[in-house]
Structure formats: C-alpha cells, structure tokens
Amino acid sequence: MAKLAAFDMDGTLLMPDHRLGEKTLSALKRLRERDITLTFATGRHVLEMHHVIGEFSLDAFLVTGNGTRIHSLEGEELYRQDLAPEAAEAVLHGKWDTQASMHVFNDGGWFTGQARPELLQAHVFSGFHYQLCDLKRMSAQHVTKICFCGDHDDLRRLRIQLNETLGDRAFLCFSAMDCLEVLPVGCNKGAALAVLSQHLGFTLQECMAFGDAMNDREMLGSVGRGFIMGNAMPQLKAELPHLPVIGDCRNQAVSHFLTHWLDNPDLPYSPE
C-alpha cells in the first residue's frame, strides 16, 4: 500500500472545465481515511491552491510552481527555490521572436503585460487572476518562474531561443502544449517530491503519482507507481513507455483507478 499519493491538477485530477469532480473528491477522501498522505503537485500558484484545498476541506501537502515551493498541511513553507536573478533578468528583457504572451510568478502572485481573458477560464473555480503590469519594470529578484503561453510550434521555436540565451542557468519544460515554463535549475515536481517524501520519512518507492504533461515526467519516473493519463501529451507517453496509461481526465479516470485500487488492490486494473 502506498503511503503518499501525488496528483497533477490540470489534465489529471481536474476535468477539462478545470473543476474537481464529485467522484474524484470522494476518492481523495477515501485515501485520507486509509491514512495515505495527499500531495497536489502543480504548476499553479500556492495562493490559488490554498483556496482549492480550503474549498474542498482536503488535507494535502502542496508542491506548487512546478516544484519551486513546498507547503505543509498547515501552510508552512517547507522548501523554496527561485530563478537565478540573472536568468530572470535575461528572460524579462530579452527580445524574443514569438507571438506568445509572457507571465511572471513570484510570491505576490501572477503578473503579465497584456490582458489574456481566455487564460482565466482555467481559474474559474478559484477566482485566481493575473495582475497587469510592465514586466520590464519588474524585479528579477525572487521570481518563482516565468512562462510563455501560445501556439505550440511557436513555443518550440521560442524554446530554442531561450536555450541559446540561458544555457544551463534555467530548466525549460512544457506544462501543456500551449505553455512553456522557465524554471530554476534542478527544479521539477520529482525533485520536490523527493524532498517532501524525505521530510515525511517515506521513500519514493512508497509513493504513487499521476500526471499528463512533460512537467510531470520526473515525478512519474521516480515514484514506485507512476500513472499516465490517457489524454497525456504524446511526448510524455513516449518518454515513459513502461508506465501504465489510465483513462481520460474528462471521465475522472483518477477516481476510477483509485476506487478499483482501494476495493480490489490485488486485481489487475483496466481503464475500460
């Protein structure tokens, strides 16, 4: 029996409308009744996630900003890592050949230079909102991460530009087909989960995890049992071909698997 279960949010635990389904909520509560520790491992901001777990009365550790922050059940910060200021400065003031919009995150929230109301659809359940500002006037100190949102092919070309400029000063990954993230070196959900599991006295082999995007790769590949969503990015399935693929987030597939696992732990699972 696993001691810790870690869940990505968008495309995994949440349905396509970015809401938490009733079956999923019920399955999570059953895990807690079995004394299995819950962790939400997400690219979302901790300010937003505090609202989410409060709304649903869930006791869960938080890995936020794709591994840049870890918070306890009580909201205590257990770990933090920021982008190197020179890397943040280079991104903020670079001249990038892209149509993608830039978004900057720090402990104060989410900041962008242009209104993108369509992006708020992913935050309807929490009400979390970007703050408009002149990004070139932002401090490069204490930046958690920077992300670019736009067309995937455009972002792939942008990634080449960013790699050429940043080199080994940052870690780049796709958290979705339309979102490219610039993170601190060595920062990912898997590394954060290793820190958290050690803090709790668990091994990664005693953890299970669920995800759908390339920012879940390290986490899924490092735990005892990693599960890929049926709706996952093709690149993730290709990178971790040995991991089982469950159903689609639109069908609350995580709850389907967990219900089977809790009720019939010794029987093989089929997503059908």
Curated annotation (Swiss-Prot):
UniProt-listed NCBIfam families: Cof-subfamily, HAD-SF-IIB, PRK15126.1
Catalysed reactions, semicolon-separated: 4-amino-2-methyl-5-(diphosphooxymethyl)pyrimidine + H2O = 4-amino-2-methyl-5-(phosphooxymethyl)pyrimidine + phosphate + H(+)
Keyword Endoplasmic reticulum: no
Chain segments annotated as transmembrane: none
Cofactor: Mg(2+)
Chain residues that bind Mg(2+): 8, 10, 212
Keyword entries, A-Z: Hydrolase, Magnesium, Metal-binding
Family as reported in the entry's similarity comment: Belongs to the HAD-like hydrolase superfamily. Cof family.
Species per Swiss-Prot/TrEMBL record: Klebsiella pneumoniae subsp. pneumoniae (strain ATCC 700721 / MGH 78578)
Gene Ontology molecular function: any one: 4-amino-5-hydroxymethyl-2-methylpyrimidine diphosphatase activity
Xref: Pfam families: Hydrolase_3
Protein name: HMP-PP phosphatase
Function: Catalyzes the hydrolysis of 4-amino-2-methyl-5-hydroxymethylpyrimidine pyrophosphate (HMP-PP) to 4-amino-2-methyl-5-hydroxymethylpyrimidine phosphate (HMP-P).
SUPFAM superfamilies named among the record's database cross-references: HAD-like
Gene: cof
Statement: the UniProt record of this protein carries the keyword Kinase: no
EC number(s) stated in the UniProt entry for this protein: 3.6.1.-
Active site, renumbered: 8
